[in-house]
Regions:
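Residue-level signature of catalytic and energy-coupling elements of molecular machines
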Residues: 16, 72, 164, 216
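Intrinsically disordered, compositionally biased charged tails
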Residues: 1-7, 226-310
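N-terminal cationic and glycine-rich segments that engage phosphates or anionic surfaces
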Residues: 2-69, 75-76, 80-123, 134-137, ...
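Small/polar loops that bind or transfer phosphate-bearing groups
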Residues: 74-75, 167-168, 205
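Long, charge-patterned amphipathic alpha-helical coiled-coil/hairpin "stalk" segments used as oligomerization
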Residues: 90-201
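Short glycine/threonine-rich loop/turn motifs
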Residues: 175-233
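Short phosphate-engaging motifs
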Residues: 78-79, 171-172, 209
Length: 310
């Protein structure tokens, strides 16, 4: 176990996750996560970072396994492309352009804007768009492009996210404030100049270097993938159990139907001798009738003989 932890720390070190900000820009609340000071820069304790990655990963895995969404937020230049790529890989919503004010606290209005984007798409599909004037089409196209840029990545988010993952909480302070107001759990890469007290799951790390961001985001995406895999496996096992539960019922019905058929066959076989008996009786009837005819003839002859004598 120690070897795995050391390997993880070495990878974090190679990615430059340990570099903090200048000592004069530090936030004293980050002191527990700072290992030392070197050349006027704070060095982050990577053993604590590794532990926090593990802790955050477990929580993210549970959220993903429950089928809820995690909203990724990163608008700084060196982070936006990496975060967008990782979020797409796990089919999660993300914001990499300017944070729309009220994105969480005024979610109903944001949803209306997203629906407006969908309406424009429908207009283009059914031909309504072409009935507009050239000027109107240009205005609609500009509006669609603006909405796509700011809200395109959250188009499928029909309700508030279950959690927020933020890169640089100081820069994304509006997003953090909105999440706090709505009691949405916050996961974040927290540098030495940030306040960790408002974050639920902090990952002390360098949030300025793209290599460091990529390393942390890869670990986060892997945790989310595990959760999604667990959810998929759970669904498959539930469907399998349901199918197995239905199978015995069908077998039982088949087994119950079999004796009925057998009974029908037996009844037919039992009925056969009765029919034979009826036939025998009918066949026997002429034999009984034959002596009766002889008796009648005998009586007729006797009567004729009596008349002759008279």
């Amino acid at each position: 176990m120690a070897k795995d932890n050391n390997t993880e720390v070495k990878e974090l070190l190679n990615a430059g996750v340990h570099f903090g900000h200048l000592t004069r820009k530090w936030n004293p609340n980050m002191a527990p996560y700072i290992y030392m000071e070197r050349n006027g820069i704070h060095i982050i304790n990577l053993y604590k970072t590794a532990a926090k990655i593990q802790e955050a990963g477990e929580a993210l895995k549970k959220i993903a396994a429950s089928g809820r969404k995690i909203l990724f937020v990163a608008t700084k230049k060196q982070a936006k492309d990496i975060v967008a790529e990782k979020a797409k890989s796990v089919n999660m919503p993300y914001i990499t352009e300017r944070w729309p004010g009220g994105m969480l606290t005024n979610f109903v209005t944001i949803r209306k804007a997203v629906k407006k984007m969908a309406t424009i798409d429908r207009m283009k599909q059914d031909g309504t768009f072409m009935t507009l004037s050239k000027k109107e089409r240009l205005q609609v196209d500009r509006l669609r492009a603006k909405l796509e840029k700011n809200l395109g990545s959250i188009g499928e988010m029909s309700r508030l996210p279950a959690a927020l993952f933020v890169v640089d909480t100081t820069r994304e302070h509006i997003a953090v404030a909105e999440a706090i107001k709505l009691n949405i759990p916050i996961f974040a890469m927290v540098d030495t100049n940030c306040d960790p007290r408002v974050i639920d799951y902090i990952i002390p790390s360098n949030d300025d270097a793209s290599k460091s961001i990529d390393k942390i985001m890869t670990a986060v995406a892997d945790a989310v993938k595990e959760g999604l895999s667990e959810r998929k496996a759970g669904k498959e096992s539930a469907e399998k159990a349901k199918a197995e539960k239905q199978a015995p019922v069908e077998t039982k019905e088949t087994e119950e139907a079999a004796p009925v058929k057998e009974a029908a066959v037996v009844t037919e076989e039992t009925a056969a001798p009765k029919e034979a008996a009826v036939v025998s009786e009918e066949a026997a009837a002429p034999k009984k009738a034959a002596p009766a005819k002889k008796a009648v003839k005998k009586e007729v002859k006797q009567e004729e003989a009596t008349k002759e004598e008279e």
